[in-house]
Protein backbone atom coordinates (compact mmCIF):
# COMPACT_ATOMS: atom_id res chain seq x y z
CA UNK A 1 0.00 0.00 0.00
CA UNK A 2 1.27 3.47 -0.89
CA UNK A 3 0.06 7.02 -0.31
CA UNK A 4 0.59 9.89 -2.72
CA UNK A 5 0.20 13.50 -1.59
CA UNK A 6 -1.31 16.18 -3.79
CA UNK A 7 -1.38 19.95 -3.30
CA UNK A 8 -3.44 21.51 -6.08
CA UNK A 9 -5.64 23.84 -4.01
CA UNK A 10 -3.66 26.84 -5.25
CA UNK A 11 -3.96 29.69 -7.74
CA UNK A 12 -2.43 27.60 -10.54
CA UNK A 13 -4.73 24.60 -9.91
CA UNK A 14 -1.71 22.36 -10.50
CA UNK A 15 -0.03 19.91 -8.16
CA UNK A 16 2.74 21.86 -6.38
CA UNK A 17 3.63 19.22 -3.78
CA UNK A 18 7.14 18.60 -5.10
CA UNK A 19 7.96 22.33 -5.09
CA UNK A 20 6.43 23.43 -1.79
CA UNK A 21 6.38 20.54 0.69
CA UNK A 22 9.70 19.80 2.41
CA UNK A 23 8.63 17.29 5.07
CA UNK A 24 5.78 14.85 5.74
CA UNK A 25 4.49 13.41 9.01
CA UNK A 26 1.74 10.82 8.56
CA UNK A 27 -0.45 9.21 11.23
CA UNK A 28 -2.79 6.22 10.87
CA UNK A 29 -5.72 5.65 13.24
CA UNK A 30 -7.90 2.57 13.60
CA UNK A 31 -11.69 2.57 13.65
CA UNK A 32 -11.59 3.46 17.37
CA UNK A 33 -9.62 6.62 16.65
CA UNK A 34 -6.43 5.25 18.23
CA UNK A 35 -2.98 5.81 16.73
CA UNK A 36 -1.56 2.56 15.34
CA UNK A 37 1.25 3.78 13.08
CA UNK A 38 3.17 6.92 12.13
CA UNK A 39 6.00 7.81 9.78
CA UNK A 40 8.16 10.80 8.80
CA UNK A 41 10.00 11.64 5.60
CA UNK A 42 11.75 14.80 4.46
CA UNK A 43 14.38 16.11 2.08
CA UNK A 44 15.10 15.49 -1.57
CA UNK A 45 13.03 12.32 -1.79
CA UNK A 46 9.87 14.45 -1.65
CA UNK A 47 10.96 16.43 -4.70
CA UNK A 48 10.72 13.45 -7.04
CA UNK A 49 7.59 13.62 -9.13
CA UNK A 50 6.70 9.99 -8.38
CA UNK A 51 7.12 10.14 -4.59
CA UNK A 52 4.79 7.98 -2.50
CA UNK A 53 4.96 6.91 1.14
CA UNK A 54 4.72 3.20 1.88
CA UNK A 55 1.92 2.34 4.31
CA UNK A 56 3.19 -0.29 6.74
CA UNK A 57 -0.31 -1.34 7.74
CA UNK A 58 -2.33 -4.54 7.86
CA UNK A 59 -5.52 -4.79 5.78
CA UNK A 60 -8.36 -2.87 7.38
CA UNK A 61 -10.06 0.50 7.72
CA UNK A 62 -7.99 3.52 8.75
CA UNK A 63 -8.17 7.26 9.00
CA UNK A 64 -4.95 8.86 7.74
CA UNK A 65 -3.90 12.34 8.84
CA UNK A 66 -0.84 14.35 7.82
CA UNK A 67 0.94 17.48 8.94
CA UNK A 68 3.41 18.52 6.26
CA UNK A 69 6.09 21.20 6.47
CA UNK A 70 6.79 20.97 10.20
CA UNK A 71 10.54 21.06 9.46
CA UNK A 72 11.72 20.05 12.94
CA UNK A 73 9.21 22.32 14.66
CA UNK A 74 10.79 25.58 13.53
CA UNK A 75 7.45 27.36 13.00
CA UNK A 76 4.78 24.98 14.30
CA UNK A 77 4.73 22.24 16.93
CA UNK A 78 2.51 19.16 16.91
CA UNK A 79 1.60 17.28 20.07
CA UNK A 80 3.85 14.31 20.78
CA UNK A 81 2.14 11.16 19.54
CA UNK A 82 2.46 7.94 21.50
CA UNK A 83 0.93 4.58 20.65
CA UNK A 84 -2.85 4.51 21.25
CA UNK A 85 -3.11 8.30 21.55
CA UNK A 86 -6.35 9.70 20.20
CA UNK A 87 -6.73 11.45 16.88
CA UNK A 88 -8.16 14.51 18.62
CA UNK A 89 -4.91 14.86 20.59
CA UNK A 90 -2.86 15.73 17.50
CA UNK A 91 -3.29 19.47 17.24
CA UNK A 92 -0.73 21.88 15.81
CA UNK A 93 0.35 25.15 17.46
CA UNK A 94 2.18 28.18 16.14
CA UNK A 95 5.44 28.98 17.92
CA UNK A 96 4.96 32.46 19.32
CA UNK A 97 6.71 35.00 21.52
CA UNK A 98 5.37 37.13 24.35
CA UNK A 99 5.65 40.89 24.17
CA UNK A 100 6.28 41.66 27.84
CA UNK A 101 5.36 45.32 27.37
CA UNK A 102 1.85 44.58 26.08
CA UNK A 103 1.27 41.04 27.33
CA UNK A 104 0.25 40.00 23.79
CA UNK A 105 1.84 37.13 21.87
CA UNK A 106 3.37 37.78 18.46
CA UNK A 107 5.15 36.14 15.52
CA UNK A 108 7.69 37.95 13.37
CA UNK A 109 8.97 35.02 11.31
CA UNK A 110 8.56 33.96 7.71
CA UNK A 111 6.74 30.81 8.75
CA UNK A 112 7.63 27.54 7.09
CA UNK A 113 4.73 26.54 4.81
CA UNK A 114 2.38 24.23 6.73
CA UNK A 115 -0.02 21.74 5.13
CA UNK A 116 -2.75 19.46 6.47
CA UNK A 117 -4.36 16.41 4.93
CA UNK A 118 -6.76 13.63 5.91
CA UNK A 119 -8.14 10.56 4.17
CA UNK A 120 -10.22 7.50 5.05
CA UNK A 121 -8.91 4.32 3.44
CA UNK A 122 -9.95 0.67 3.33
CA UNK A 123 -6.90 -1.48 2.71
CA UNK A 124 -7.95 -4.79 1.10
CA UNK A 125 -6.26 -8.11 1.68
CA UNK A 126 -3.28 -8.18 -0.62
CA UNK A 127 -2.63 -11.88 -1.07
CA UNK A 128 -1.71 -11.49 -4.73
CA UNK A 129 1.00 -8.92 -4.00
CA UNK A 130 -0.70 -6.17 -5.99
CA UNK A 131 -0.03 -2.48 -5.46
CA UNK A 132 -2.64 -0.08 -4.10
CA UNK A 133 -2.01 3.67 -4.22
CA UNK A 134 -4.20 6.24 -2.50
CA UNK A 135 -4.12 10.01 -2.94
CA UNK A 136 -4.34 12.50 -0.06
CA UNK A 137 -5.21 16.13 -0.94
CA UNK A 138 -3.45 18.79 1.12
CA UNK A 139 -4.61 22.20 2.32
CA UNK A 140 -2.07 24.97 2.90
CA UNK A 141 -2.34 26.52 6.36
CA UNK A 142 0.00 29.50 5.96
CA UNK A 143 -0.38 32.71 3.97
CA UNK A 144 2.26 35.24 2.90
CA UNK A 145 1.13 38.84 2.43
CA UNK A 146 3.12 41.50 0.60
CA UNK A 147 1.76 44.95 1.43
CA UNK A 148 2.64 47.97 -0.72
CA UNK A 149 1.90 51.42 0.74
CA UNK A 150 2.06 54.43 -1.54
CA UNK A 151 0.83 58.02 -1.36
CA UNK A 152 -1.86 58.91 -3.89
CA UNK A 153 -0.39 62.39 -4.28
CA UNK A 154 2.88 60.96 -5.55
CA UNK A 155 4.78 61.89 -2.41
CA UNK A 156 7.64 59.55 -1.50
CA UNK A 157 7.08 57.23 1.47
CA UNK A 158 9.77 56.12 3.90
CA UNK A 159 9.18 52.53 5.01
CA UNK A 160 10.82 53.26 8.38
CA UNK A 161 8.00 55.67 9.25
CA UNK A 162 5.35 52.92 9.48
CA UNK A 163 4.54 49.67 11.27
CA UNK A 164 2.52 46.84 9.75
CA UNK A 165 0.77 43.99 11.57
CA UNK A 166 -2.01 41.43 11.19
CA UNK A 167 -4.08 40.49 14.24
CA UNK A 168 -6.04 37.25 14.68
CA UNK A 169 -6.69 34.30 17.01
CA UNK A 170 -5.59 31.56 14.62
CA UNK A 171 -2.39 30.03 15.99
CA UNK A 172 -3.87 26.75 17.21
CA UNK A 173 -5.14 24.21 14.65
CA UNK A 174 -7.12 21.08 15.54
CA UNK A 175 -6.65 17.59 14.11
CA UNK A 176 -9.38 18.23 11.53
CA UNK A 177 -7.81 21.54 10.42
CA UNK A 178 -10.38 23.68 12.20
CA UNK A 179 -9.23 26.41 14.56
CA UNK A 180 -9.17 25.86 18.31
CA UNK A 181 -9.79 28.67 20.77
CA UNK A 182 -6.53 30.62 20.97
CA UNK A 183 -5.14 33.80 22.43
CA UNK A 184 -4.78 36.95 20.29
CA UNK A 185 -1.68 36.89 18.10
CA UNK A 186 -0.05 39.85 16.39
CA UNK A 187 1.83 38.94 13.21
CA UNK A 188 4.64 41.39 12.64
CA UNK A 189 6.70 41.98 9.52
CA UNK A 190 9.70 39.79 8.79
CA UNK A 191 10.80 42.01 5.91
CA UNK A 192 10.34 45.72 5.13
CA UNK A 193 12.00 47.64 2.34
CA UNK A 194 11.56 50.57 -0.01
CA UNK A 195 10.34 50.05 -3.54
CA UNK A 196 9.25 52.10 -6.53
CA UNK A 197 5.94 52.52 -8.31
CA UNK A 198 4.59 54.61 -11.15
CA UNK A 199 1.95 57.16 -10.13
CA UNK A 200 -0.26 58.91 -12.68
CA UNK A 201 -0.44 62.60 -11.68
CA UNK A 202 -2.55 65.32 -13.30
CA UNK A 203 -0.52 68.30 -14.48
CA UNK A 204 -3.37 70.23 -16.07
CA UNK A 205 -6.98 69.93 -17.13
CA UNK A 206 -6.24 67.46 -19.91
CA UNK A 207 -2.68 66.35 -19.27
CA UNK A 208 -1.17 63.78 -16.94
CA UNK A 209 2.32 62.47 -16.30
CA UNK A 210 3.59 59.24 -14.78
CA UNK A 211 6.08 59.81 -11.98
CA UNK A 212 8.20 57.19 -10.23
CA UNK A 213 7.80 57.44 -6.45
CA UNK A 214 9.14 55.54 -3.46
CA UNK A 215 6.73 53.16 -1.75
CA UNK A 216 6.89 51.11 1.45
CA UNK A 217 6.80 47.31 1.10
CA UNK A 218 6.16 44.95 4.02
CA UNK A 219 5.98 41.15 4.10
CA UNK A 220 4.18 39.11 6.76
CA UNK A 221 3.36 35.40 7.11
CA UNK A 222 0.31 34.25 9.07
CA UNK A 223 -1.25 30.98 10.15
CA UNK A 224 -4.49 29.57 8.76
CA UNK A 225 -7.16 32.15 7.90
CA UNK A 226 -10.75 30.90 7.90
CA UNK A 227 -14.21 32.39 7.60
CA UNK A 228 -15.99 32.35 10.94
CA UNK A 229 -19.10 33.76 12.56
CA UNK A 230 -17.99 37.38 12.82
CA UNK A 231 -20.67 38.05 15.42
CA UNK A 232 -18.64 35.82 17.76
CA UNK A 233 -15.10 36.49 16.55
CA UNK A 234 -13.15 39.58 15.55
CA UNK A 235 -12.15 39.75 11.90
CA UNK A 236 -8.42 39.33 11.20
CA UNK A 237 -7.22 42.84 10.37
CA UNK A 238 -4.20 44.33 8.63
CA UNK A 239 -3.20 47.34 10.73
CA UNK A 240 -0.90 50.08 9.41
CA UNK A 241 0.23 52.82 11.77
CA UNK A 242 2.78 55.59 11.83
CA UNK A 243 5.63 55.24 14.29
CA UNK A 244 3.76 57.71 16.49
CA UNK A 245 0.81 55.31 16.68
CA UNK A 246 -1.56 57.11 14.29
CA UNK A 247 -3.82 54.69 12.43
CA UNK A 248 -3.27 54.81 8.67
CA UNK A 249 -5.34 51.82 7.56
CA UNK A 250 -7.35 48.94 9.02
CA UNK A 251 -8.24 46.31 6.41
CA UNK A 252 -10.11 42.96 6.82
CA UNK A 253 -7.26 40.89 5.42
CA UNK A 254 -9.27 37.69 4.96
CA UNK A 255 -11.03 39.37 2.03
CA UNK A 256 -7.69 39.26 0.18
CA UNK A 257 -6.51 35.78 1.24
Locations of regions flagged by a protein language model:
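Short, low-hydrophobicity acidic/polar segments
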Residues: 34-140
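Tryptophan-paired
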Residues: 24-79, 158-257
Amino acid sequence: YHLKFRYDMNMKFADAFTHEVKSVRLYAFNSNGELVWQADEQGEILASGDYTMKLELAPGDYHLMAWCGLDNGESFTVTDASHNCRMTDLHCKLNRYLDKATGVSYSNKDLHPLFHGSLDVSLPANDDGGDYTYVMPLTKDTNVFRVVLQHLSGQDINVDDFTFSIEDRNGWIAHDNTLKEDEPIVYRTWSTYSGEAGVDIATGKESRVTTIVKVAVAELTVSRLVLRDWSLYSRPMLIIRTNEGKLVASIPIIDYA
